[in-house]
Amino acid sequence: MAETIHFSEKFRTALAKYFAYKSVTDHAFNHNIDSEFSGSDVVHVYEIATTELNDYNKKQDPSTGSRFGNVVEVGDHRYTFRLSQDISLDRSVDRGNNNAQFNIKKSGAIMKAYTDKRIRPRKDKYRLKKWAEEAGIHVALDAAPTTSTIVKQIINLHNAMIDEDVPEGEGTLYISRTYVEALMLADQWVGLDSLGGKTLPKGCPGMFDGLVVQPVSSRIFPENCYFAIFVKDAIIAPEKINTFRGIKDSENMDGDRLQYRCKFDAFVMPSQAAGAAVACAKGTVTPTPTVAIAGGKATVTSNEGVVYYTLDGSDPRYQSADAKVYSAAVAVAKGDIFRCCAKAEGKWQSAATYNEVTA
């Protein structure tokens, strides 16, 4: 009769730590939400909807109104994150080919090999692609980076993030190996940031403009992307191991089996979207739509792709519960916040517009 070995949490944790050590992405994202997916493939995230501040009015008569200004109820935006990736393996060890006892040590060796060659590259590739697709900032460069242009291009992209109030620090510059030479041979690389005793993730050659530099194999780097900057609080990559077990004396064969299944995904946090920025190839970014509001209607003009919009101020680029496909002028009322974006097949998504309806 077959005997099933359900590996302990301690062994699973050790495997996760090994993956993190090898991964080029595991150090870069926020793990705070990981536990929310422990019992579900879907998590609804509520983010506070902020509004403009009031000016305190000392001349206001308290009997007729508040000196603090108009009272506005705090609202929120709901976004839905769903794990879409579901990978598995079912591997056998025939007793005629391997006389070693099937145990934790043996299964660990098998999983180590698959982690190195299959699991880690697939997860890293997917994460980078998904974060790049959902990034809040996409900048199309006129030409591919060179030794004389790459430093300015990186600084400009980082500045675009800071101009959107993205805090400095906890950021990683991901760059394809194709363009690492251009960066490291640039004159400014000689003035590399002092690490100040900071320990860098494995494989990172240094820091530049306050960012950890993480070279990535061109084989797993997103297409039409030269480099990208991701701030830790802006990106997540939840996963959960559904099955991890060994079956001794399996039926239909003289040997043992190892079964593994893992669900995972990667997302950009909508309220932190500007903390993910991508330098793209020319002509690969969907143009941002233009919006005209008049006569109680919002009219959108877009040259490419499908336009999505919201009326509550939530970001239509993400899994907003309020997002709808635009087909004709939309009725709006005072207080609505009309936002829209365009998504075209084979291109990076556009920026999101922001129009507050005041009349």
Locations of the language-model features?
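N-terminal "assembly arms/tails" that initiate or stabilize quaternary assembly
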Residues: 1-80
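Short, compositionally stereotyped local motifs that mark structural "simplifiers"
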Residues: 281-359
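Short helix/loop capping segments that flank catalytic or ligand/cofactor-binding pockets
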Residues: 53-56, 91-92, 182-185, 269
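Signature of extracytoplasmic/envelope-associated structural regions
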Residues: 2-5, 15, 32, 36-41, ...
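Alpha-helical scaffold segments that mediate packing/assembly in large oligomeric complexes
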Residues: 94-164, 279-282, 336, 359
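Long, hydrophobic/aromatic-enriched structural stretches that serve as scaffold segments
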Residues: 70-108
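Extended, compositionally biased alpha-helical segments that mediate assembly or anchoring
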Residues: 242, 246-288
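Extended oligomerization regions of viral-like shell subunits
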Residues: 39, 44, 161-246
